[in-house]
Amino acid sequence: MGILFTRIWRLFNHQEHKVIIVGLDNAGKTTILYQFSMNEVVHTSPTIGSNVEEIVINNTRFLMWDIGGQESLRSSWNTYYTNTEFVIVVVDSTDRERISVTREELYKMLAHEDLRKAGLLIFANKQDVKECMTVAEISQFLKLTSIKDHQWHIQACCALTGEGLCQGLEWMMSRLKIR
């Protein structure tokens, strides 16, 4: 009886799942957010603070917070961590010079108590650009295989065309089903 009630509750319960979208400046975070919410590319300028949109997929509601990635704003990322279920890290696959900064910020986040149960989705953005880093290279640079206490997935994407974004959302949806 308890299992049946749980399944019925899940069908009608439209719980909101908090997602934060982080990454260095110019990685494509805002473009990805608006691809999710409007399915189109919008003109963006550097995010000061955050943008927030509700995305509904198959009766599952995600409240997505796109947080500014400039160096001066990164120290305030932790103010968004409370109740976060998923962290989306957007990596600019063309930015070889700052991949080590991305790694440093990633591990700083993962060590935070408020994110101990959060799933991690890495979007390797700008895969349409010639000579960008591959998903395998980014995975190696970020040392993703060393992450043992978080479920994680890396997904190649192009924010401008939307390619790869649905696969990332599908991974998040699959994580919700096994909870």
Swiss-Prot record:
GO MF term (any one): GTPase activity
Domain of life: Eukaryota
Keywords attached to this entry: GTP-binding, Lipoprotein, Myristate, Nucleotide-binding
Gene3D superfamilies: P-loop containing nucleotide triphosphate hydrolases
One of the Pfam families matching this protein, by short name: Arf
GO BP terms: intracellular protein transport; protein localization to Golgi membrane; vesicle-mediated transport
Xref: InterPro entries: P-loop_NTPase (IPR027417), Small_GTP-bd (IPR005225), Small_GTPase_ARF (IPR024156), Small_GTPase_ARF/SAR (IPR006689)
Lipidation (N-myristoyl glycine): G2
UniProt-annotated binding residues for GTP: 23-30, 66-70, 125-128, 159
One GO CC term on file: trans-Golgi network
NCBIfam families: small_GTP (TIGR00231)
Record function comment: Lacks ADP-ribosylation enhancing activity.
Record-stated family: Belongs to the small GTPase superfamily. Arf family.
Protein name: ADP-ribosylation factor-like protein 5A
